[in-house]
Each structure stands twice: as C-alpha cells, then as structure tokens.
Amino acid sequence: MLVLSRKVNESIKINSDIEVLILEIKKDTVKIAIKAPENIKIFRSEIYKFIIEENKKSILKDKHNISKIKSLFNHYFKNEN
C-alpha cells in the first residue's frame, strides 16, 4: 500500500487517466474529487461491499431457482414417457 500526504488543492495521479484531488479537509473528513474515464466505476467502499453482498445473494437465489426448474422439468418429462 502506498501512503501519501496531500494538502488542499494537491492531487495524485493513477496511471495517466485518473486524478484524485483533495478539495477540503475538516476535522475528521476529507473531501476528494476523482477525475477518471467514464468506463472506470468508482464506488465508496461501503457501497461496493453492499453491491457485492447483494450480487452473492442474487446468485444463490438464481441457483436455487434453476434447481427448482430443473426438478420440475425432470418430473414433467418422466411423467410424459
């Protein structure tokens, strides 16, 4: 992990296309601006963790539903013969 100190109106560059600018520092809060290409997704970490958890729940639900559908198809086709 790289640790840097920055003052208000100073920035860091990540590769050539991402810039993180320090806008404001108050007590225990730092306000930043991030300039990045539109195809780069930027999330607050707590939001990103929430998205990951919701995606995991969705996958488990889908697996359960697929299993139910498979069971119904198997039951249906066994009764057709």
UniProtKB/Swiss-Prot annotation:
Pfam family name, one: CsrA
InterPro entries for the chain: CsrA, CsrA_sf
UniProt keyword terms in alphabetical order: Bacterial flagellum biogenesis, Cytoplasm, Repressor, RNA-binding, Translation regulation
Localisation per UniProt entry: Cytoplasm
Single Gene Ontology BP annotation: regulation of carbohydrate metabolic process
Superkingdom to which the source organism belongs: Bacteria
Family: Belongs to the CsrA/RsmA family.
Subunit structure: Homodimer; the beta-strands of each monomer intercalate to form a hydrophobic core, while the alpha-helices form wings that extend away from the core.
Function: A translational regulator that binds mRNA to regulate translation initiation and/or mRNA stability. Usually binds in the 5'-UTR at or near the Shine-Dalgarno sequence preventing ribosome-binding, thus repressing translation. Its main target seems to be the major flagellin gene, while its function is anatagonized by FliW.
Protein name stated in the entry: Translational regulator CsrA
